[in-house]
Amino acid sequence: MQGSSTSILHFVPSDPTSTSVLDFLSPTPRGTSPVHDRRLHAGDLALRAGGDRLLVADTVAAVVESLVQAWRQVRMELLVPLLRGAVVACMVMSVIVLAEKVFLGVVSAVVKLLRRRPARLYRCDPVVVEDDDEAGRASFPMVLVQIPMYNEKEVYQLSIGAACRLTWPADRLIVQVLDDSTDAIVKELVRKECERWGKKGINVKYETRKDRAGYKAGNLREGMRRGYVQGCEFVAMLDADFQPPPDFLLKTVPFLVHNPRLALVQTRWEFVNANDCLLTRMQEMSMDYHFKVEQEAGSSLCNFFGYNGTAGVWRRQVIDESGGWEDRTTAEDMDLALRAGLLGWEFVYVGSIKVKSELPSTLKAYRSQQHRWSCGPALLFKKMFWEILAAKKVSFWKKLYMTYDFFIARRIISTFFTFFFFSVLLPMKVFFPEVQIPLWELILIPTAIILLHSVGTPRSIHLIILWFLFENVMALHRLKATLIGFFEAGRANEWIVTQKLGNIQKLKSIVRVTKNCRFKDRFHCLELFIGGFLLTSACYDYLYRDDIFYIFLLSQSIIYFAIGFEFMGVSVSS
């Protein structure tokens, strides 16, 4: 036994660095073996990393769970009540909008059914012409025709020529061309055109000024200061692209001659390029409704409506009494009409007299025009609200029409409802099934509004759904302009002259899409963003909701994208 024990005790490796079985069986003090230390350290790190990963996973899960709970709480306690409140607000606004349109439509229909034409309500006998030529000419009142223009190279000949061809004694007519052009070549062309008509015996006055202060209002105000204007009893106004028929004055001036309380005769616009593209067809539908329903109703109800800025004839005395042309807003025409209306003067709209004009053919021109037409009235309403309420020469009902119907319902509530309901609330409803919209608000009211608008242009009734989607997009632009005007932001008084392309024969020769039309100039981020939001809502509704609401959302998103990339209208080089 001793021998075997001795042999076992003396079984020691000769190499001190080698590892024996006992090294693994018995604990070895730390640091006695580098290899052992490395393996032990790696194991510790692995265990520690695994523990850290489990800890991170638990932490992330806890954070996600808390975020989900927070989102559910925010959703149920904040967003859902807000959206339900928005639904109620839109219900009220939709009723207001529909009631206003039904009211105007009924008035317009009654006027037509009862044949209450202006010629039957007002005396408008032709101006008496005596046998003697000199006496006959003297019986015609002196009329001034004002044509303000700014770099109107494509159309200046149209308006000047049409004004000079008006059937009226030459010695009783003054054509005043107010040229604010900054292009020397255009200025020279306009001057020579005036000289050409002057040589034909027409009394044409070519007027310029040093600067463009006040834009169109400043130009008209400067023209009214000329000495020869004081001898004129009536003032007809034409924008550079308007072409009145030869008998324009023969049909309009008698209303003012025989009715001393009338201040303004407004005629209807007719569009020479309505069939040029889809954009002009959409505009024609809106403008026809404006003239046939809104202007007709305003004229019949309380002898007041917004002056359209052109194709109208004013009593010069009224312009002076009302304070002349003001440039405090971009709606100088509406400004003058309001001030004249508050003095008790009456207006008449004569829809049977049509004046040819041009619709904006490019989306850029149309957007700038709509900005001006939305921004100006909003600022004007802000400036004149208390003045309207304090007016003593108008009745309570006329004040109500001026404030509620003319401004609040038609220009503020209608614009806000159209954009917010169809482009914000409806797509958000897809993600919030808890929010319910009544069927009558969702379908019946929009359908009624569409049908009421279709009466303006019966020939385009097949485009009424497309017009509805188009107007929803333009409501975004109008709402933005309305807010800018009301709060007098940076572009509140921005005046950009609407680009005109001339008559249809010239338009046919224009290249529709030019190579130098840069992509960034056709890129409108806000429309594209909302279009993307609507497209996302449409996809979500198709995948997760059991309805066909995605059809409307998809259709509306397509129109947003079409306008966002300027795929409507004519594209021309600048």
UniProtKB/Swiss-Prot annotation:
GO cellular component terms, A-Z: Golgi apparatus; Golgi membrane
UniProt topology in membrane: Multi-pass membrane protein
Family of this protein: Belongs to the glycosyltransferase 2 family. Plant cellulose synthase-like A subfamily.
Keywords: Cell wall biogenesis/degradation, Glycosyltransferase, Golgi apparatus, Membrane, Transferase, Transmembrane, Transmembrane helix
Gene: CSLA6
Pfam families according to UniProt: Glyco_trans_2_3 (PF13632)
Compartment(s): Golgi apparatus membrane
Coiled-coil regions listed in the entry: none
CDD domains linked: CESA_CaSu_A2 (cd06437)
Chain ranges passing through the membrane: 87-107, 412-432, 437-457, 523-543, 548-568
Binding-site positions, substrate: 239, 241
Protein's job: Probable mannan synthase which consists of a 4-beta-mannosyltransferase activity on mannan using GDP-mannose. The beta-1,4-mannan product is the backbone for galactomannan synthesis by galactomannan galactosyltransferase. Galactomannan is a noncellulosic polysaccharides of plant cell wall.
Catalysed reactions, semicolon-separated: GDP-mannose + (glucomannan)n = GDP + (glucomannan)n+1
Species: Oryza sativa subsp. japonica
Active-site residues annotated for this sequence: 180, 333
The protein's Enzyme Commission number: 2.4.1.32
GO molecular function annotation: glucomannan 4-beta-mannosyltransferase activity; mannan synthase activity
Gene3D superfamilies: Spore Coat Polysaccharide Biosynthesis Protein SpsA, Chain A
Any one biological process term the GO annotation gives: cell wall organization
Name assigned to this protein: Probable glucomannan 4-beta-mannosyltransferase 6
InterPro entries referenced in this protein's UniProt entry, alphabetically: Glyco_trans_2-like (IPR001173), Nucleotide-diphossugar_trans (IPR029044)
Annotated disulfide bonds: none
Broad class of enzyme this protein falls into: transferase
